[in-house]
């Protein structure tokens, strides 16, 4: 993160913020990667006018672990008295969940005199996500998994020992445009000072979603080292 003036008078200045991070998550085989940069440019021709261009770009090739585990084997021990290892990952070995964000806009204000000041803020943002994941959905004996063919194939005595899993294939794009314009008025009536803020704003948002879900193979909690299938085997 660094900033500086581009001229001796301070009329033009900039700021550049960046981030790069890569780490292994707690769950086995899960990674987190994030890269971001946020350039900004400011123009101040005088002490009454300020214009700042803002932008932000972020890419996350891997967002980390996506899933959840039941109380069996975590909060409560399994029937064999053991618990799942803390790095247990019930997902497929090739789960993917990526995200990409970008934003551009500006902030402008100008003071006409001691009474009137105008401000305007404009933003355009876009967020894209892509996910192909298998995740836990409670033990097979849970009534919520009554429609799972994989759980139904198990013997009743085994259903409490197997983790039901679902899969999700999801591609989303969210776009947002907003602009607001404000007029600030300062005046007095007798001994009372007033500040009146008036304005108008506009926002448009669109979200495109292409997704589907379903049940995947269940996992035996008594043998958590059994490798889950690759994503795509059953989809």
Label each region the model flagged.
Residues 12-16, 51-53, 118-122, 194-200:
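Transmembrane beta-strands of outer-membrane beta-barrel proteins
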Residues 116-121, 126, 179:
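P-loop NTPase catalytic cores that bind/hydrolyze ATP
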Residues 30-31, 121-123, 134-136, 195-198, ...:
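Composition- and surface-driven signal marking solvent-exposed, interaction-prone regions
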Residues 21-25, 38-44, 48-111, 115, ...:
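Acidic/polar loop-and-plug regions of large Gram-negative outer-membrane beta-barrel proteins
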Residues 1, 191-196, 200-235:
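Outer-membrane beta-barrel transmembrane domain signature of Gram-negative proteins
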Residues 1-37, 45-49, 102:
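Outer-membrane beta-barrel translocator/receptor signature
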Residues 7-12, 47-48, 113-115, 188-196:
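Short loop/turn motifs that connect adjacent beta-strands in outer-membrane beta-barrel proteins
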């Amino acid at each position: 993160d660094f900033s500086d003036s581009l001229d001796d008078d301070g009329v033009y200045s900039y700021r550049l913020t960046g981030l790069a991070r890569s780490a292994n998550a707690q769950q086995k085989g899960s990674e987190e990667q994030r890269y971001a940069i946020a350039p900004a440019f400011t123009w101040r021709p005088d002490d009454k006018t300020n214009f700042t261009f803002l932008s932000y770009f972020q890419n996350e090739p891997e967002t980390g672990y996506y899933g959840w585990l039941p109380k069996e084997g975590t909060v409560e021990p399994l029937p064999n008295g053991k618990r799942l290892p803390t790095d247990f990952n019930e997902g497929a070995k090739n789960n993917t969940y990526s995200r990409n964000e970008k934003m551009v806009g500006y902030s402008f204000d100008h003071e006409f005199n001691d009474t009137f000041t105008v401000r305007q803020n404009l933003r355009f943002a876009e967020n894209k996500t892509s996910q192909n994941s298998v995740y836990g959905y409670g033990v097979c004996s849970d009534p919520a998994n009554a429609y799972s063919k994989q759980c139904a194939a198990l013997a009743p005595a085994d259903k409490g020992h197997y983790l039901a899993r679902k899969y999700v294939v999801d591609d989303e794009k969210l776009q947002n445009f907003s602009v607001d314009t404000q007029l600030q008025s300062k005046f007095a009536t007798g001994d009372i000072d007033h500040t009146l803020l008036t304005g108008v704003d506009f926002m448009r948002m669109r979200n495109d979603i292409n997704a589907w879900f379903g049940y995947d193979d269940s996992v035996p909690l008594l043998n958590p080292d059994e490798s889950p299938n690759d994503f795509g085997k059953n989809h």
